[in-house]
């Protein structure tokens, strides 16, 4: 019988504990962790993500700001806004919601964020810390998945872990975090040959490609742990993952659902890293 990895329940537990830590920080040091989310344009999915982040931040006792900009905003204006928040001592975390309009260079925007406030973990300084085995700010989705492994007692050392998708947001940082735990990692992508055969060797299979129900039972060995990062809409508008949940559940020992799996943990780690940034500010 497959065990469902309930990311929603774990996120609720962690956010409740975080709210208590925030309350203590405010009482003892007079500091409230501050998070600003900058949204450019009117991408419907991004709007949903931003609302969820704002709601969770306020519920945990954070100072939360959301800046909504027209998709016609120029890159220089956006960088100027980021610089203002870099200098704002009441803001400990800055997140620019991706994707950005085509006329704005993502890399330039990420570089503009103070690495100490880069709670998405995308700044080259933070990726350098991650790849040198000294993680500081870590991309939130991989960080959330690692918390799931810990909470559910999933052993990583010596296990074969296969990641489908090599993005800077999930695939690459996920690979490094697993290597740090002594897993044997294979990072696959759209040019990988015999993908199904490689996936069938996985004790732990992590999928982040943005293609609904791409991973079927033909990709999964019996007893594997399957982590589905995908968020897609089917023809009826229903939210589905990259993994064909029903058929893969027949083989997997543990699996994350969509929705209610990885997504809530991503937001939780965003808040946790903002809190940690506020703590570091106190100790300076």
UniProtKB/Swiss-Prot annotation:
Binding site for NADP(+): 165-167, 190
Keyword terms, alphabetized: Amino-acid biosynthesis, Histidine biosynthesis, Hydrolase, Methionine biosynthesis, Multifunctional enzyme, NADP, One-carbon metabolism, Oxidoreductase, Purine biosynthesis
InterPro entries named in the record: Aminoacid_DH-like_N_sf, NAD(P)-bd_dom_sf, THF_DH/CycHdrlase, THF_DH/CycHdrlase_cat_dom, THF_DH/CycHdrlase_CS, THF_DH/CycHdrlase_NAD-bd_dom
Keyword Ligase included in the entry's annotation: no
GO biological process, one term: purine nucleotide biosynthetic process
UniProt-listed Enzyme Commission number(s): 1.5.1.5, 3.5.4.9
Entries under Pfam families matching the protein: THF_DHG_CYH (PF00763), THF_DHG_CYH_C (PF02882)
GO CC term, one of those recorded: cytosol
Single GO MF descriptor: methenyltetrahydrofolate cyclohydrolase activity
Entry function: Catalyzes the oxidation of 5,10-methylenetetrahydrofolate to 5,10-methenyltetrahydrofolate and then the hydrolysis of 5,10-methenyltetrahydrofolate to 10-formyltetrahydrofolate.
Binding partners and assembly: Homodimer.
PANTHER family reported in the protein's UniProt record: C-1-TETRAHYDROFOLATE SYNTHASE, CYTOPLASMIC, C-1-TETRAHYDROFOLATE SYNTHASE, CYTOPLASMIC-RELATED
Protein name as it appears in the record: Bifunctional protein FolD
Organism: Streptococcus equi subsp. zooepidemicus (strain H70)
Lineage, broadest ranks: Bacteria, Bacillati, Bacillota, Bacilli, Lactobacillales
């Amino acid at each position: 019988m497959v065990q469902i990895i309930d990311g929603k329940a774990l996120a609720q537990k962690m956010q409740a504990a975080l709210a208590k830590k925030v309350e203590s920080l405010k009482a003892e040091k007079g500091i409230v962790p501050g998070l600003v989310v900058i949204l450019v344009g009117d991408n419907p999915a991004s709007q949903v993500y931003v609302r969820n982040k704002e709601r969770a931040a306020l519920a945990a006792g954070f100072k939360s700001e959301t800046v909504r900009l027209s998709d016609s905003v120029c890159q220089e204006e956006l960088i100027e806004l980021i610089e203002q928040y870099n200098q704002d001592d009441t803001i400990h975390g800055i997140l620019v919601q991706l994707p950005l309009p085509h006329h704005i260079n993502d890399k330039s925007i990420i570089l503009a964020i103070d690495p100490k406030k880069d709670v998405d973990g995308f700044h080259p300084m933070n990726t350098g810390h991650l790849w040198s085995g000294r993680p500081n700010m870590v991309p939130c989705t991989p960080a959330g998945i690692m918390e799931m492994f810990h909470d559910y007692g999933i052993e990583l050392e010596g296990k074969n872990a296969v990641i489908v998708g090599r993005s800077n947001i999930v695939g690459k940082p996920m690979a490094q975090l697993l290597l740090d735990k002594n897993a044997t990692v294979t990072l696959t992508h759209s040019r990988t040959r015999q993908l199904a055969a490689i996936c069938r060797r996985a004790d732990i299979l992590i999928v982040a490609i943005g293609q609904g129900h791409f991973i079927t039972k033909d990709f999964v060995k019996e007893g594997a742990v399957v982590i589905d990062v995908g968020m897609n809409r089917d023809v009826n508008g229903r939210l589905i993952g990259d993994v064909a949940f029903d058929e893969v559940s027949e083989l997997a020992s543990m699996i994350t659902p969509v929705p209610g799996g990885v997504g809530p943990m991503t937001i939780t780690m965003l808040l946790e890293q903002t809190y940690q940034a506020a703590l570091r500010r106190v100790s300076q």
